[in-house]
Regions:
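Positively charged n-region of N-terminal signal peptides that target proteins for export
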Residues: 1-4
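Bacterial N-terminal signal peptides
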Residues: 6-15
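A sequence-level/structural motif corresponding to short, flexible coil/turn segments enriched
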Residues: 20-408
């Protein structure tokens, strides 16, 4: 009788485990947006009825971006319905080189896009010597424009119907790479990185909605980067990235730590929280509402995708790490979502044993348990969630961007 009771308990436990385990489902893009050069989608944002993407194109022409390439690269923004139908698009470029790296939707429905641009400089003409040899009578052109590095922060304002409303510019000294634009009631805040030879430092800059910029504020100067950020209810900012140098008298714990920075609304660095593991380099690559953070851990012989939910700066509620070939992108809604390229088992998805690295999308509950899991046809480059549309993933196969929607 005792053995029978134990057997029944084991069977019931196995039944509950199987019932609670997530099953990996396959997804397919609603549409695919083809390209021919090194194009990128950098950001996605959602309205109750539309999906808006922004990025950079180097393709000479495009079936889904109006107009032809002006410089070596143009920024772009495009809007689609929740079913993948094209609504509008606009090319953000002129004869200089532009990139578009982040977008945010304002309360009035207009869209702000941050990026960077170069400038075209015309060199001073020089008069060739009178006796210069020119047997073929070649016509000399001394005024071929020269492109500067991407040292200008660019901000574009676009209406909800796809009309360009304003363009603002801040000229810097070195190569500059905006990573995130945040919108408040009165201001725009751009965070990112500044490159000087072999060093990199993070930056903060604010602008009014009429294009008046404050002085730029820098954090670190050797090996500090900001990759993403969110606005907090008190007006402060939580930014995530990596650093291998002293910040606010907080020393690095390894060669490169994942860092979370609390920054005041005026750009003052207030707190620094570092995450590290022995003999690793770490970085946070994204952050969602409610302090859901995603990144990567690099060991000498493997890489892990890291996903952590915090209650406050440096105070984790739950965290998971999975064998991976990429960093983790995260987004928050009623639940927590993460996407990465999986190269190993996933706790909570017992049948998942990939034979080769495979992009996946995972949904987590309040305690970090896996609720649902999905495969993607290509690696994800952008992720967003809202209640009306669901979870939206932009994938990149190397020849086309895919628009994937998972309804909650």
């Amino acid at each position: 009788m005792k053995r029978f009771f134990i057997a029944v308990v084991i069977i019931l436990n196995c039944s509950f485990t199987s019932a609670n385990a997530a099953v990996m489902k396959n997804t397919k893009p609603l549409i695919e947006l083809t390209y021919s050069k090194s194009d990128q989608v950098s950001s996605v944002a959602l309205t109750p009825v539309s999906i808006i993407i922004s990025g950079t194109t180097e393709s000479p022409s495009s079936a889904w971006i109006n107009g032809a390439l002006a410089g070596s690269s143009d920024g772009f923004i495009a809007s689609y319905s929740s079913l993948g139908a094209p609504l509008w698009n606009i090319r953000l470029g002129n004869t200089a080189n532009e990139i578009a790296t982040s977008l945010a939707i304002d309360l009035d429905g207009s869209i702000w896009v941050a990026g960077a641009s170069s400038a075209l400089l015309t060199p001073n003409p020089t008069t060739p010597p009178v006796k210069a040899l020119n047997p073929d009578n070649v016509i000399l052109d001394p005024s071929v424009p020269i492109s500067t590095p991407l040292n200008r922060i660019k901000i574009w304002q676009i209406s909800s119907t796809g009309n360009l409303l304003n363009t603002f510019e801040y000229v810097g000294e070195n190569i500059i790479y905006p990573k995130k634009i945040l919108v408040t009631e009165t201001n725009l805040i751009v965070l990112g990185n500044i490159y000087d030879k072999s060093s990199v430092g993070a930056f903060y800059i604010s602008a009014s909605k009429t294009g008046l910029f404050t002085p730029i504020i820098k954090y670190g100067s050797k090996s500090t980067q900001i990759n993403s950020a969110i606005s907090n209810k008190d007006g402060s900012i939580t930014a995530v990235g990596s650093s291998g140098e002293l910040l606010l008298k907080v020393k690095p714990l390894s060669k490169v730590d994942a860092v979370t920075l609390k920054i005041s609304s005026s750009g003052v660095l207030q707190q620094v929280a570092r995450a590290t593991l022995k003999s690793t380099t770490r970085s946070w690559g994204s952050i969602g509402a409610g302090l859901l953070q995603g990144g990567r851990v690099n060991y000498s012989n493997k890489t892990e995708a890291a996903i952590t939910k915090f209650s406050a700066l440096g105070k984790p509620v739950w965290n998971v790490r999975y064998l991976a070939k990429s960093s983790a992108l995260v987004a928050s809604g009623n639940t927590s979502w993460a996407t990465y390229t999986s190269s190993g088992v996933i706790k909570g998805v017992p049948a998942w044993k990939p034979k080769s690295p495979t992009p996946v999308l995972i949904e987590f509950g309040k305690k970090g348990e896996v609720i649902s899991s999905h495969t993607l046809t290509s690696p994800a480059v952008a992720l967003a969630v809202n209640n009306e549309i669901g979870t939206v993933v932009i994938t990149d196969s190397g020849v086309a961007f895919g628009l994937v929607v998972v309804n909650q």
